[in-house]
């Protein structure tokens, strides 16, 4: 329906009838024209035409009649949704359209107001074709109608309130109406007869003449509760009334009928179909518990309170009605849950509270007979409780009802209220009735109730299990029972009780025992089959002596009660208590011995039996077999595609491209999970900034080596040693290896035993050394060491080894601790080295003069880079060792470089060259340089001695 709104109509809303044209202008030119008093509006400014509804448009919920707006060549023009249409036509396509006439500040709004009626027809009414009458009355009014509840439904037309579509309407904020609502709409749209061009009531004022849906509410039926009409008004709180609840149905038709309403209230509905005479109660109970997230049988863990699982009962009429009644009675007792009826959904929706649908069974387990004797309350609230109790307790014997009925005529003065039961008899002796009346009355009461005579002290377990459920409902009736008590005879008073105990059937004891303790029941059956007593007899306590009894009685003298009966004290005494404890221990010891003896006998019997004597079938019968559901693998398996996951709702396209930070894996993935690599970071102490030399200068490192000295000290030592050598003309060099054998050989050659060894022992590891090789031209044989022969000295870069005959300033056993001590030690070492070099040079010259010497001449040709050398002279006879020296020298060539000169070939002495090579050392000696002049003469330089080192020039 199209509605016209504007402030020009004093806040009224006007209905635009299909098939009619409306004229807007400044003056009234014809009937039905709408006047707008504004100077910028022409006298005939605009027309709005509503097309007729096409045939079948009433059932097309998405269609609507066309609206054509035409500007009649107005002076200022017309704006339709911001578009100027002066002298043009346009068709409205929006739900809300704004029209501005000229420069008038007040605009017109044409709004689409959908009216959709959903009818709840029965199958019989649908066969009568109700759509013809609806088409004639509603289609041309632009009102839509449907047989199903649609999201756009505004009204549900039904004859009852508690229907599936009615529940959906209440949850979604819609109205429930009857057929009278349609008649009221048709009446409001009728045009008065005899008045041409007149408008209907809705065209004049839509809000005032539209019928009120609450006035056309269906009549009240069998639904519980007595609510006012305003309760059925739309309420936004009902949209989530079933949130958190799961309703389980076991009948398909009922499930299909209530599923839309439950889904509309954000609830969840499940179907577990049962087959009459085939479906087991335990199977259904396990399903209900699994839906609730629990296992096994028994009641709900939350006590059927709050949000959770609710079972909807179904009690059809027909052949299977008895089976359905017994079925829901049994599972209700096992679950301790009260199944609801579908009529109760309306009550929960109207109250916006679904907690009333989930209650334990004992909350509504009032006996029907007792509730009838209580003063009637509101009939609407009591009715569902009575019906539930009737259906749940069908298995209870019907003979118990008369026992709870109390005649209303027997009333007298109220007796004092007693909080606990008395075991004694009442003081009231009764009236003087005949004995026949008393005898006749007693059997009638017993036969009517069929309850055996109860002991004076009832069992506490029976009271706690079965009577406690009825205490709240019986509380109002207790004073009445006490008031009429004095009016009854003594025998009648004994037969009537305040609370009737519901006896358990005898055949249920074994089944109840099997459910509670299956192992104990199995042991009991085996003992019965073996011919033994199912329950071993308890040992009889030892009789007490008379004197002890007398003593105990004296300690607790008798006292009289209110009725004059002598009673004893509650406590028995410490001695009896100790004997009871001893009896318990003795009983436990006997049972343990019996169990051990039985086990030993069983083992002995099994050892004597053969393979043929064992009854395997009996053993198999003792096996407990339980069936469990096995989860079936998915049809696609692990090879599912992303499209299938999106279609099934397992994957959201918005997750594409996100990194798998939590390292999820697909279900069933066989890939080996890589272990997380752990990194161990060692921690080192941060050394603070130190000033000065530090500990590293004085201490040794981890390997026991002394750190190297600074370069300045090494340079100073080298320069000092060089000056000593230049002054003496000899190089006191020492050559030594890394082992102990090399040190011993050096001590023998040099003739300083003990000095070098002591110096080597002081150092744990020698520092890097350099070897100085000196060529000697003497004819002495080196096979035997001579104390005057030049040897091989080793000069260390860090600290020279000097053999001195003078005592050292600092003892060798005491290490140096300061720079001054070290400097003094080095000075002593240098003085000793210089003295030793001079003595060795003098001895060497004397030995050369005595044994004979030879001269090696080095010749350097002018303009040439080659150097030639030769040896001349022979030794006179044999030397003092008796060996003949060689008589010639093998010439060799050497090249001179820019900075030094090295000998490439040749040897000083042929006999000892190989020996020296094997020993790892080279020969050395002094050369007499001869320079050839230009005129061919030679100039000898005896004083200048050239010292050579193989590999480099010093």
Curated annotation (Swiss-Prot):
GO terms for molecular function: damaged DNA binding. The keyword DNA damage applies. Residues 368-431, 444-506, 528-580, 630-654, 692-954 are annotated as: Disordered. Residues 541-554, 936-945 have a biased composition (Acidic residues). One of its GO terms (biological process) is mitotic G2 DNA damage checkpoint signaling. Residues 22-85 form the FHA domain. Belongs to the Nibrin family. The FHA and BRCT domains specifically recognize and bind phosphorylated proteins. This is DNA repair and telomere maintenance protein NBS1. It comes from Chaetomium thermophilum (strain DSM 1495 / CBS 144.50 / IMI 039719) (Thermochaetoides thermophila). The lineage of its organism: Eukaryota, Fungi, Dikarya, Ascomycota, Pezizomycotina. The gene is NBS1.
